[in-house]
């Protein structure tokens, strides 16, 4: 494993569970993939680091036997909308600030253990994985007339901690788990190799549509600063009633472990901070807890550089992957 706060040497392999589900004629198996996966999967098949293999990945998933192939980006858009509106509500009604992002499950667990006083600051929004999973077990199940108990919801993630997240108590919108099985980018690569698919020669195919197309804001979730930038864009649009096409948030982009900035939103100075890597998070949160640092929004990612450097990605030095994928 590339990144793990507890020092795990390897992930728990769930590929056989997925294969068994696909081979069960009574189950409808639906898969979603995070944006960081398409930027790294090609490395397992000899392609240059950072090659976008979205189309071939979708084709491979269909040939593995998945009934529907969805893009987690749509769930990310929903997370953005909810998080931006939650921030607006807290500002207008004197809610708990700073609002701290909650889509990195390793970070959330770290907060619960070491900074319990800040758990009320965490956004109440589900992560993109869980948003998409909830849609699959509710909207998709209702549309297709399928009992949610007969749907196996699978996610492909760059993150090993997603295996933990799917089993949290509050992740069951339809009364059944939003996501049943989570596998990593490396596990998907193993499945493709076991099926003897010639990945490089696969055609380019599109995701199945969810409720419409997703946005670029959803795609940047995979890089440190991306969640905060997406939420700021949305909050500014909602508060000012204008679609801002050309606002630049350069100060919170890039691979540095700690970034901060102040942006003018609807006449208000919004102070924000972005941290990736738990060492950096630990230092910042101590300052927030003591009152030494004061922000409106804080983004925390467990892995240095964000999800592109997740523990389930192909093995590469994190500095190499950060430079390639985020750019």
Where are these regions (language model features)?
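Iron-sulfur-associated redox domains of electron-transfer enzymes in respiratory
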Residues: 10-327
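Cysteine-centered iron-sulfur cluster-binding motifs in ferredoxin-type domains/subunits
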Residues: 1-7, 302
